[in-house]
């Protein structure tokens, strides 16, 4: 069933792409159509597609029955809107961070003929979302709520990115700016809203629910998103590269839960080691930081955090009156609890 759903989901991508390449609001010529075609294929469908597929999964769990072809198409279209939004964030994020690779291939802006055209491509990706929503949801009673939801989540994500950028200004490796509360705010706004809340909120709207009645669901999903990012930081340092599929850079980079915890637990001498070595790319500095993490037993600290977070999340989920909503939230948690990559 899962692979069948994924193939249907990918088929919807082709349909949406074809519609966008023939959007009557713009007079395409061969070169521009070819550019958009290549840009979309390079940036939109390349990831794990978890966010997009979660809309379909969540809607199915809310409905509690087989979905019609029309429902699969609409839930998939909303899922793809999230993947489009994600592509827009990543294309611009990579330019801001000066990154080299994304999903195992060069970042879009690193391609010889792309460069800073990628900034405009990011804007086009962002503007495709309302085009898709208008074409397929304009007649739905929840259309305005959908548009509002995407606008709000985009604002929250961009604001989270801003806190991250101004806290970790390149060249100003100032650990004193960093604390658990700042880390939490960055994660909440930059990751949790669009990765965890948005897919479920889309499914709830499509199911006819009023999001104002589901503030508790939002809170649980934001907590889940925070837990997911802490896992990510942990795996970046302690996960096996062949399992996580990338080489960790958090000791060289910056905003990691591990360094925040280390600062909290370290004595003055250990803090000095951190301040002198954190954020540097040379292997000896990275090794010193990792050695300090081991001395502070951050693996044990993370395991405690993981089990406490899990128990709190389960308690919150089981307090929800709707069994269908519980199933949606438990399905999300099941995908990430104790993951290795």
Curated annotation (Swiss-Prot):
Sites binding Mg(2+) 2 sit at 93, 97
Q: How is the cofactor bound?
A: Binds 2 Mg(2+) ions per subunit.
User: For this UniProt entry, which residues form the secretion signal?
Assistant: none
User: What Gene Ontology molecular-function terms does this entry list?
Assistant: (2E,6E)-farnesyl diphosphate synthase activity; dimethylallyltranstransferase activity; metal ion binding
Query: Which biological process annotations from GO are given for this protein?
Result: cholesterol biosynthetic process; farnesyl diphosphate biosynthetic process; geranyl diphosphate biosynthetic process
Broad class of where this protein is predominantly found: cytoplasm
Can you tell me which residues bind dimethylallyl diphosphate?
102, 190-191, 229, 246
Which InterPro entries does the record associate with it? FPS1-like, Isoprenoid_synthase_dom_sf, Polyprenyl_synt, Polyprenyl_synt_CS
Q: Where in the cell is it found?
A: Cytoplasm
Q: Which cofactor does it need?
A: Mg(2+)
A GO cellular component entry from the record: cytoplasm
Superkingdom of the source species: Eukaryota
* Chain residues that bind isopentenyl diphosphate: 48, 51, 86, 103
Q: Which PANTHER family match?
A: FARNESYL PYROPHOSPHATE SYNTHASE, FARNESYL-PYROPHOSPHATE SYNTHETASE
What function does the entry list?
Catalyzes the sequential condensation of isopentenyl pyrophosphate with the allylic pyrophosphates, dimethylallyl pyrophosphate, and then with the resultant geranylpyrophosphate to the ultimate product farnesyl pyrophosphate.
Q: What is this protein called?
A: Farnesyl pyrophosphate synthase
Q: What organism is the protein native to?
A: Helianthus annuus (Common sunflower)
Q: What is the lineage of its organism?
A: Eukaryota, Viridiplantae, Streptophyta, Embryophyta, Tracheophyta
Which gene holds the coding sequence for this protein? FPS1
């Amino acid at each position: 069933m899962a692979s069948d759903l994924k193939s249907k989901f990918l088929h919807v991508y082709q349909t949406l792409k074809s519609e966008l390449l023939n959007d009557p609001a713009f007079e395409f010529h061969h070169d521009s159509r070819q550019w958009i075609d290549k840009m979309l294929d390079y940036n939109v469908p390349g990831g794990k597609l978890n966010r997009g597929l979660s809309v379909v999964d969540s809607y199915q769990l809310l409905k509690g029955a087989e979905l019609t072809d029309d429902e699969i198409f609409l839930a998939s279209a909303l899922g793809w809107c999230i993947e489009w939004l994600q592509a827009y964030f990543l294309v611009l994020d990579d330019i801001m961070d000066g990154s080299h690779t994304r999903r195992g291939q060069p970042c879009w802006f690193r391609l010889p003929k792309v460069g800073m055209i990628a900034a405009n491509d990011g804007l086009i990706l962002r503007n495709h979302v309302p085009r898709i929503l208008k074409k397929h949801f304009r007649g739905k009673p929840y259309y305005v709520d959908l548009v509002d939801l995407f606008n709000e989540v985009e604002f929250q994500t961009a604001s989270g990115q801003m806190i991250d950028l101004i806290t970790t200004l390149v060249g100003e490796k100032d650990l004193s700016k960093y604390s658990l509360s700042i880390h939490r705010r960055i994660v909440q706004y930059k990751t949790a809203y669009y990765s965890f809340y948005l897919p479920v909120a889309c499914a709830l709207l499509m199911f006819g629910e009023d999001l104002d009645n589901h503030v508790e669901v939002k809170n649980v999903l934001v907590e889940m998103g925070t837990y997911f990012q802490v896992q990510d930081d942990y795996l970046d340092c302690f996960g096996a590269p062949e399992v996580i599929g990338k080489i960790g850079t958090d000791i060289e980079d910056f905003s990691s839960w591990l360094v925040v915890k280390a600062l909290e637990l370290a004595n003055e001498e250990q803090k000095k080691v951190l301040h002198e070595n954190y954020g540097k790319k040379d292997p000896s500095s990275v090794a010193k930081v990792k050695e300090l993490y081991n001395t502070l037993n951050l693996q044990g600290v993370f395991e405690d955090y993981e089990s406490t977070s899990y128990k709190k999340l389960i308690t919150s989920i089981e307090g929800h009156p709707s069994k269908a909503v519980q199933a949606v939230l438990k399905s999300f948690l099941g995908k990430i609890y104790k993951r290795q990559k």
